[in-house]
Amino acid sequence: MSGETAFYSFTSWDPVWVLSISSSLVITFLFLVEKWLLSPSGALPWIGEKPGLFPRISACLRGEKEGLPGLRAAYTRFGSKGKFFVKPDVGFQPEIMVPREHIRWVLDQPQDVLSIHEARYEKFALDLILPEQDSVIDRVFLDTIHHKMTRNLLKLQGVFAEEVSFNLDAALGIDTEKWIEANVWETVEKAVFPALIRILVGQSVCRNDAFREDVSSFSKAFGFSTILVGNLLPRFLKPTVGRLLSSLTMFRQQRMLKKWFIPLVEERFYKLLRKSQDPTLDYTPPPDLVTWASDALLSTGNVERCSPTGFSRRLAIMIPAASPSTKATATNVIYDVLSCPPDMKVQDHLYNEIASALNSSPDKGWADQGLLPRLVLLNSAIRETMRCHPVSSINVERKVVAKGGVTLPSGYHLPKGTMLGVPAVGIHADENIYPDAAKYDPFRHCNRRPGEKLDEKDTAVPLTSIGVVNVTDTFLPFGVGKFACPGRWLAAHLIKLTVAYLLYNYELKSFDQRPLNTVILGKSMPDRQATMMVRRRKH
């Protein structure tokens, strides 16, 4: 016994032995990560891979440092030549970058081979935040957005104009003599958020400060889960550590649902149910997503399955999904327009276009359904901002879900669980697609420049531009194909209206230098501290 005791005492406490064993375990673990976890891409080139003992682990740890410049450089070197390459990830979840020539191949794969649903759930940690999601409710919401909400946007122009004008006037004032300094991000938020909430949830809460605070609290927690659990935490830790880290998000979600969403949804749903059973009932529901989705769920005939909790949870998650990118893009547009050289007269051209498009008739004005479609130059300026500053550097993301994996057109085989995406920032900066791509050219997407001298034969050709929502394999902020962002029409509508109202009603001093964006985990967000000098115009 004494010999055994001495042995265990030695092995338990000898620092040399402990250090040797620990070092061996660490090296073994790193070797397994290098060879197994980071090997699915085979011989594909990696961004930032350098010779060394653990080149791919090192590349992953440097991934955030490489950032957008590294992704653009890799696209130029590989993607622009039709080659697949690998973007390392600080969470040890490398992603295969798909060149533009093979986007169609990705889109043609069935969802049981390359799944957009599984990719989104992993990237946003939705499997932890929405553990009881119902595919029927998901489908109803998507169909409602496509077939009801999008088709009613122009009809609701007056509603949007009411929210944007009320909130911008309150934020910036109506004093035509005094210049004021205003935070750009906060100003945009005050205009966009209420308008977004009004069409998603309804008029009863869109200006409620307590509702805004609770939604903001949940959105911040959701963002925390997305960054930490969805992007930083290694996949094998998500079921345990990820669930623990998502508990704050779940708590804030449940509190928000019980306080706001479930009572509102229950009231609306059962009023519509009574209306469907008794057409003579005196009830006119407000035109918003709650009404349209409730109608669609009732039309399925499966009322028992339509849980107000499940409905509310899906509705609530749409706000942090839609609001940040819409606010970021509107802020970026303002930064870009105010940063253009004075000799381009961008503000003047946009103001004159808006002034010409506005119909001063009492029943028209900002409520005119035809107003926004007439803003061709502004449409181009917004599209150019989204080209230069897409919120997501990678889009069209998919996850390999086929049991046997999938083989790329180039011949490389990818196992189940591999992530793929398209480097949007690389394509958007490709000189072969967009000449002088590094320059913000607000009227790049028009068929001619404002003030351009025309031949007599061309004067009859109207000024046009490519629509903000038009997705192609060279313009990817919204994705591409049938799974492109279904809410892009709403986002574009709110951005265009907000910027148009601001430029028409307020003088804005130009920036000496554009405020810089911050890139975190592939997401490019505008400076939230930058301010602008504004003064109400005298009309």
Swiss-Prot record:
Binding sites annotated in the UniProt record for heme: P435
Use case: Polytolypin and biosynthesis intermediate compounds show antifungal activity and can efficiently inhibit the growth of the pathogenic funfus Candida albicans.
Domain of life: Eukaryota
Known catalytic reactions: 2alpha-hydroxyl, 4beta-carboxyl motiol + 4 reduced [NADPH--hemoprotein reductase] + 4 O2 = polytolypin + 4 oxidized [NADPH--hemoprotein reductase] + 5 H2O + 5 H(+); 4beta-carboxyl motiol + 4 reduced [NADPH--hemoprotein reductase] + 4 O2 = 2-deoxypolytolypin + 4 oxidized [NADPH--hemoprotein reductase] + 5 H2O + 5 H(+)
Entries under Pfam families matching the protein: p450 (PF00067)
CDD domains, per the entry: CYP503A1-like
Function summary: Cytochrome P450 monooxygenase; part of the gene cluster that mediates the biosynthesis of antifungal fernane-type triterpenoid polytolypin. PolE acts as a dual functional P450 monooxygenase which can catalyze the formation of both the 1-beta-hydroxyl group and 10-beta-carboxyl group, however the oxidation sequence of polE has still to be determined.
Transmembrane segments: 13-33
Subcellular location(s) per record: Membrane
InterPro entries for the chain: Cyt_P450, Cyt_P450_E_grp-IV, Cyt_P450_sf
Enzyme nomenclature, EC number: 1.-.-.-
Annotated membrane topology: Single-pass membrane protein
Protein name: Cytochrome P450 monooxygenase polE
Family note: Belongs to the cytochrome P450 family.
UniProt-listed Gene3D superfamilies: Cytochrome P450 (1.10.630.10)
Keyword Oxidoreductase tagged: yes
GO terms, biological process: secondary metabolic process
